[in-house]
A protein has these predicted regions:
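Soluble extracytoplasmic regions of secretory-pathway and membrane proteins
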Residues: 1-232
């Protein structure tokens, strides 16, 4: 016999009364919401089940890293992600296409890892860490770079939205890692800007190149699908 459980979180609007059930039955085109005996006074509709979607609803102005990962934090499963502050108006700085810089074999073949948004920037900082509770979907945003002026501007617009870094528990801190999307952008830029000689730089000498993923098929390798970074 299968085990059952009752959701005790506060994850969405309640549909216990007949009017709410009727409205949502029409919205989703499902008569089960209206007539099923499994829908009771405590039932809820849970929207935006993806961790990235939930963070984007809370902070739509933050570009989010393409990978979120689960961890057991203080006895609860949390999805952890990275938020960036960006700008395209930083003086005397080359612009980088985020979508192009973060595309590799994982973003092409995986359904869970995505590249960054399609925009050109010349300023990028990993200023925010986000967690999403896997049970009730609650979102917490933490400041990761207190000196970032762009984040300070957002904090002044939305006071109280962010927890200070000091509130990150030791258990959560142990699971923090370097953001994958930022690493991809940095490796593309460092391929050229590690050169310190002006003559070598302008002649294109000693530039590095991210390798093609050797585990991909020959057709994918012919398209120069790049090897992704990985954690040790």
């Amino acid at each position: 016999e299968g085990a059952t459980t009752t959701f005790n979180g506060n994850g969405g609007p309640r549909i216990g009364n007949i009017f709410s059930r009727l409205i949502y039955s029409i919205k989703f085109g499902s008569d089960q919401i209206l007539f099923s005996d499994r829908v009771n006074a405590d039932s809820q509709i849970l929207y935006d089940r993806s961790p990235k979607e939930r963070v984007a609803k809370v902070a739509p102005y933050l570009p989010l890293d393409g990978r979120v990962y689960p961890a057991v934090v203080d006895g609860r499963v949390k999805w952890i992600g990275d938020g960036y502050t960006t700008s395209s108006n930083y003086p005397y700085s080359q612009k980088t296409d985020l979508a192009e810089a973060t595309q590799d074999s994982t973003t092409i073949s995986s359904q869970t890892v995505q590249g960054l948004t399609d925009k050109e920037v010349n300023y990028m900082r990993n200023s925010v860490k986000a967690t999403v509770d896997a049970y009730d979907g609650s979102v917490d945003l933490y400041t990761w770079d207190d000196s970032d002026p762009v984040l300070k501007a957002w904090q002044s617009i939305f006071p109280g939205q962010y927890h200070p870094m000091s509130e990150i528990s030791g258990d959560l801190m142990a699971h923090m890692r370097y953001p994958e999307g930022m690493f991809k952008v940095q490796r593309q830029l460092l391929a050229k800007y590690h050169v310190t000689s002006a003559s070598q730089f302008f002649s294109g000498e000693d530039f590095w190149q991210t390798p093609v993923d050797p585990t991909e098929s020959k057709s994918e390798q012919s398209r120069d699908v790049l090897q992704p970074p990985y954690y040790l």
